Amino acid sequence: MKYSIIIPVYNRPEEISELLDSLSRLSPCGQEYEIIVVEDGSTKPCEAIVKGYEAVEPVRYLKKENAGPGPARNFGAEAAKGEWLIFLDSDTIIPAGWLCAIERSLGAVREDWKCNYAAFGGPDRASADFTPVQKAISYSMTSFLTTGGIRGGKRKITRFFPRSFNMAVRADVFREMGGFAPMRFGEDMDLSMRIVEAGYHTSLVEDAWVFHKRRTDLSKFGRQVLNSGRARIALSRRHPGSLKLVHLFPLCFVIASVLVLPFDVLFCLLVLFDSTIKQMKDGQGFPSAFAIGLMSIGASYVQLWGYGLGFVAALFSKTAVSENINNERFYN
């Protein structure tokens, strides 16, 4: 078997239903695969939903005590049979051509990379039926203006490190690395960094994109990016030298937005223009595109301020690396 698709879930049965429905519509790629759903101690189980798909796709349901998404992925990997372990978040929806894009990319790997090619990931985007807030959040998490090119996309200014919302690792390398570390945040980046540090190659597969719903409101999004800022410090302590100038951008943004009023005005106008144009290219009419553009300003401020404040908080914390993961907050 070539592919094992592993999905950790905690109290999100409705998301699993949508995700499995999308996976049931995958275009044939000529390779055998399996789907493993790992219930991480949920109080709202999705077992009945998963069992309902057993007749139409090769899905298995596993359950364990709650320990967080990293350990849940490791649990699924232990039961996996595939040569490649593909990790998806439960809040993704998969287009029909996703697995075929992965198969094509593996067939096109450079000859001098084939022995040491160990991991890849795909980008994410917003679906046309996402809410305006979800589209604004998606913009803020994928725009070059707000991320500096460190997330999935064509314009990269750092090495690509796959993230677990849409990430694949060669099974033998995953086991060699010991799987995901028991970190509170940033366990996917940590694994990607360890893979690269061990001398393996990684890449972005641009055509293997997924729809990623992310958070449904700005308060949940704020908690997520606060944790992302904390994770960056944890990663820099585990991987000395990994902290780059681009990672300081959110903190610099916070300082500039407080001290320099013209900077705020210019940034808001740039985001409004860029997001509105992007939404119109995606088929939105001008009024709705402009409304999402306005929301994108708010989402961008939440992202950059949340990340920057989390970054500073972790910088002065001794527990940024050692805190364990064990509950719902780490799926929110």
Region locations from a protein language model:
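Conserved donor NDP-sugar-binding/catalytic core segment of glycosyltransferases
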Residues: 97-135, 208-209, 213
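Short, acidic, metal-binding catalytic loop of nucleotide-sugar glycosyltransferases
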Residues: 21-32
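Acidic donor-binding/catalytic loop of UDP-sugar-dependent glycosyltransferases
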Residues: 44-45, 92-105, 193
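Membrane-embedded multi-pass helical conduit in multi-pass membrane proteins
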Residues: 253-321
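A conserved acidic beta->alpha catalytic loop
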Residues: 22, 36-48, 66-67, 89-95
